[in-house]
Amino acid sequence: MVRMDLSRIRNFSIIAHVDHGKSTLADRILELTHAVSDREMREQFLDSLELERERGITIKASAVRVTYRAKDGEEYVFHLIDTPGHVDFTYEVSRALAAVEGVLLVVDASQGVEAETLAKFYMALEHGHVIIPVINKIDLPNARPLEVALEVEEVLGLPADEAIFASGKTGEGVEEILEAIVQRIPPPKGDPEAPLKALIFDSVYDAYQGVIPYLRLFEGRVRPGDRIRIYSTGKEFTVDKVGVFTPQGLVATEALEAGEVGWLVAAIRDIHDVQVGDTITLADRPTPSPYPGFRPAKPVVFAGLYPVDSGDYGKLRDALEKLKLNDAALTFEPESSTALGFGFRCGFLGLLHAEIVQERLEREFGLSLIATAPSVVYKVRLKSGEEVEVHNPADLPDPTRIEEILEPYVKLTIFTPEEYVGSLMQLLQEKRGRLVNMNYLPGAQKRVELVYEAPFAEILYDFHDRLKSVSRGYASMDYEQAGYRPGDLVKVNVLVHGEVVDALTFIAHREKAYTMARAIVDKLAEVIPRQLFEVPIQAAIGGKIIARATVKALRKDVLAKCYGGDVTRKKKLLEKQKEGKKRLKAIGKVEVPQEAFLAVLSAGRDEPKG
């Protein structure tokens, strides 16, 4: 077997803000290294999910191996690990970054440095990587490459003269990028003779071969027939085959060695056995220490998912299990609701993640689902001294037992042109935000960096859309968790015909509870079909009703057959109708239709546009 020369390997990743042209640049790199023939080339080659290509975002990390003959005449092996760009997928990015030695930081020549660029940059710095700034999209008419290069130097401290000007669309400058990868990014270190130490940075599920973990080997080697052990669970498996990633798919090889990026098949049936971020080692010669710094992904947003047809409950469970194979951050547990039947309480990394999971369930598994309003995790300190976590607003303990409720806060970093600062500050004030820092950036395009702290729940719903509309699409944001703080929060129950609909319960700040409740009951009154009796819809905090709307009763015209005639006769018929309605009202049940749940999702969140 030919030994890989470590000095000829380069492992790198591309990081960028959403839409700065990362996937297009990756396409050009594949073309220039002749990894993909012109016939096979398609846009966003590495984005394998249909959804990724449709939305134009990268959701899962994926890897590819290409060879490049550099100007020095030597042939190098590049492992490119593509990373997601959206803030929800920060953990995926951190794992992909752990597997490489250097990164290309792509910045759009017309947009400049944006919030997520900054977040990703700090992550790469934490890993101690070599960072090559690439100013992309220089073919655009409104590109300002020099100015952006200076902005990169000012904001990120990367020397402007090291920046490479390129265009993923035309291919200009890509050759220069490939040379820079060879020159500037260090080769991997590692001893193939040492005990095996491999980091799992992703995994996919294959119906025939089970879970296929994607690995970066730091030490040792692995070949078919080896007995491997998963570090955190201690489970052992026998390797069937190992191999590398080519743009055409997975290709088996004889062995993988330190410094390489590849995959293995070992008949692993349960995804929980290979958590992303775990270390794989040999059963008979384990490595003394696993790869550091990994924590299981922690969901921060929870929502209930219920099948429209209750018969699909089992199908939904299987679908969630399958998605979890590829998505370490997704959690779910069964829950039941009087209004919606049986479903699951699912945990996500953020709203985009929740949306994508729901869309994949509906698309790939043909399910139709109802999602309840997403909520964050509250911590409740009880008078007894214990602390409980609340994932579902309906589970909030009785107010008499509560000492205080803590809500999660986030630290927001917002980049915006100067003229929108006023309206953005107004929006953030509305969302109970607190200004921490404000920073004017150099350059002709007067841009400002705002740093705010705000309750996560306020940012959850329509904040991103409102941010974009207030700033005409120019502002960008990134957030990170900033711990818990006490808040004046109340649980609001929604009652339809005197019965609490648990799926509509929400937790809100006391000042905002009335406005949100009002919007929700009005919306429900519009969408709940009229019954033969009057249906009151109420919102209550504890025993106190704070908002009410009524769905008027449908009335049959009982006087239609009385032509003229005595008034007492008419009265008798009307009284009889009234009696019947009273009886109906006492025993009548109101079905809350599906649209009602969907309507409520939008209702309580549309606060008056400032």
Swiss-Prot record:
Disulfide bonds: none annotated. Pfam families: EFG_C, GTP_EFTU, GTP_EFTU_D2, LepA_C. GO terms for biological process: positive regulation of translation. It catalyses: GTP + H2O = GDP + phosphate + H(+). GO terms for cellular component: plasma membrane. CDD domains: EF4_II, EF4_III, LepA, lepA_C. It is an enzyme of class 3 (hydrolase). PROSITE patterns: G_TR_1, G_TR_2. It is found in: Cell inner membrane. GTP binds at residues 19-24, 136-139. Keywords: Cell inner membrane, Cell membrane, GTP-binding, Hydrolase, Membrane, Nucleotide-binding, Protein biosynthesis. It comes from the Bacteria. Residues 7-189 form the tr-type G domain. The keyword Transmembrane does not apply. Its EC number is 3.6.5.n1. It is a peripheral membrane protein. GO terms for molecular function: GTP binding; GTPase activity; ribosome binding; translation elongation factor activity. Belongs to the TRAFAC class translation factor GTPase superfamily. Classic translation factor GTPase family. LepA subfamily. Required for accurate and efficient protein synthesis under certain stress conditions. May act as a fidelity factor of the translation reaction, by catalyzing a one-codon backward translocation of tRNAs on improperly translocated ribosomes. Back-translocation proceeds from a post-translocation (POST) complex to a pre-translocation (PRE) complex, thus giving elongation factor G a second chance to translocate the tRNAs correctly. Binds to ribosomes in a GTP-dependent manner. HAMAP family: LepA (MF_00071). PANTHER family: TRANSLATION FACTOR GUF1 HOMOLOG, CHLOROPLASTIC, TRANSLATION FACTOR GUF1-RELATED. This is Elongation factor 4. The gene is lepA.
